[in-house]
Regions:
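Short glycine-aspartate micro-motif
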Residues: 2-6, 67-71, 179-183, 189
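Glycine-rich phosphate-binding loop of actin/hexokinase-like ATP-binding domains
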Residues: 140-230
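Adenine-nucleotide phosphate-binding core of ATP-dependent small-molecule kinases
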Residues: 240-286
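N-terminal phosphate-binding loop and adjacent alpha-helix
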Residues: 27-65, 91, 95-101
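Gly/Ser/Thr-rich active-site cleft segment
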Residues: 100-162
Length: 286
């Protein structure tokens, strides 16, 4: 079975072709921020990214008619259980409207549906374990204020895939195991997996958990309040400090850990301190 996979990121799109479990090829397109910034919304990037992916297929000599199934990265939908979901019009409308948040992952389902259509409708299109997977136990939803309920937004696809892989290595299924799984990318999320369900997880998009290359993580609430009411920043600027321009970007001006390691090797004591702090915070969350 030929499976075409589409993973849109903020400034990139990764695509891959699989024959069952075997990867045939994969490619990552990277876009200049100047190009992406010209689009007024995530949804308005759909046509651009579709055409760019078509260029890869042309280079590979592959037609969408060859695909049996197409899987797009799941975006910010209403909370749902983990699993595989077939893409439909309502899902696409919800994602493109950014009703539950704006993120490049919202383009995964629309792009998958576009390529299914381009292939003449032979292939079915799906998303798997989107970032809004919500399997929290009731206690995990409670914060210290009744007006604020915790929500589940995390790297569900990666976390659940790693849990399945770990269980398989032990000759078990995830239903037989309990894990703590840490995803460490531009954002960091740490989840408690109980027999296949993620019953609690740090929500890096809402400012929980450890800092990461691009996110602030949890901050002292009092000092954050002072920053918010200082009159120096708009709401959008504060949000940018929490997600996108926090963490390593805020401290060191880069989200590239390879660059940070080079600085440490060259004797940059500040880079070493911040790197140790990031590791410490992830360890503490685990």
């Amino acid at each position: 079975m030929k499976l075409f996979i589409i993973n849109p990121g903020s400034t990139s799109t990764k695509v891959a072709l699989f024959d069952d479990d075997e990867e045939i090829w994969s490619e990552t397109q990277r876009y200049d921020t100047d190009v992406i910034s010209k689009f007024k919304s995530i949804g308005s990037q759909e046509e651009f990214r579709f055409n760019e992916i078509c260029k890869i297929l042309k280079e590979k000599g592959v037609s969408p008619q060859e695909f049996d199934a197409i899987v797009g990265r799941g975006g910010l939908l209403r909370p749902i259980k983990g699993g595989t979901y077939e893409i439909n019009r309502k899902m696409i409308e919800e994602l493109l409207s950014s009703q539950f948040g704006s993120h490049a992952s919202n383009l995964g389902a629309p792009l998958a549906a576009r390529f299914a259509e381009a292939g003449g409708g032979k292939a079915r299109s799906f998303i798997v374990d989107p970032v809004v997977v919500d399997e929290l136990v009731d206690e995990a939803r409670i914060s210290g204020l009744p007006e604020i309920e915790r929500r589940s937004i995390f790297h569900a696809l990666n976390q659940k895939a790693v849990a399945r892989r770990g269980a398989a290595k032990m000759g078990k299924t995830v239903q037989d195991c309990n894990f703590i799984v840490a995803h460490m990318g531009g954002g960091v999320s740490v989840g408690a997996h109980e027999k296949g369900r993620v019953i609690d997880v740090s929500n890096g998009l809402d400012g929980e958990g450890p800092m990461s290359p691009e996110r602030s993580g949890a901050l002292p609430a009092g000092k954050l309040l002072s920053l918010c009411f200082s009159g120096k920043y708009t709401r959008q600027e504060i949000e940018s400090k929490l997600v996108g321009n926090g963490g390593l970007v805020a401290h060191l001006g880069t989200n590239d850990l390879i660059e940070v390691e080079k600085r440490i090797t060259n004797g940059d004591s500040r880079a070493l301190l911040i790197f140790k702090a990031l590791c410490y915070q992830v360890e503490k969350e685990i």
